[in-house]
């Protein structure tokens, strides 16, 4: 719903345009931004200095359906997302995976962690 278009803007656009940054900060979820038809990198940039937290979730397609994946193992441009969030002043990068589809969630977390370590070294 938050990315539904109303007069060429999303509900999120309206919300952030009408509020002062001192009163409203953001926390986006990369998977759901993408699923909502928007670009997570663009949203990090829109929320410059208003994005203290970000939920990093990767997006993939399994059997023709949108699905969750460990960070770095899906279709989202995680290096660009992490860089944009960092430039926006993000302080907390939270790894989350709503569904592991029967896999061990701790193993999925380990995959995400190892991938993010490679980004931190660059």
Language-model features: where?
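Histidine-acidic metal/acid-base catalytic patches
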Residues: 5-28, 32-122
């Amino acid at each position: 719903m938050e990315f539904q278009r109303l007069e060429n803007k999303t509900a999120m656009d309206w919300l952030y345009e009408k509020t002062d940054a001192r009163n409203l900060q953001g926390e986006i979820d990369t998977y759901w931004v993408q699923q909502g038809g928007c670009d997570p990198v663009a949203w990090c940039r829109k929320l410059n200095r208003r994005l203290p937290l970000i939920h990093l979730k990767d997006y993939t397609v399994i059997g023709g359906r949108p699905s969750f994946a460990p960070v770095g193992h899906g279709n989202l441009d995680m290096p660009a997302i992490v860089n944009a969030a960092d430039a926006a002043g993000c302080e907390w990068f939270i790894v989350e995976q709503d569904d592991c589809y029967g896999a061990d969630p701790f193993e999925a977390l380990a995959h995400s962690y190892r991938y993010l370590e490679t980004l931190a070294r660059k």
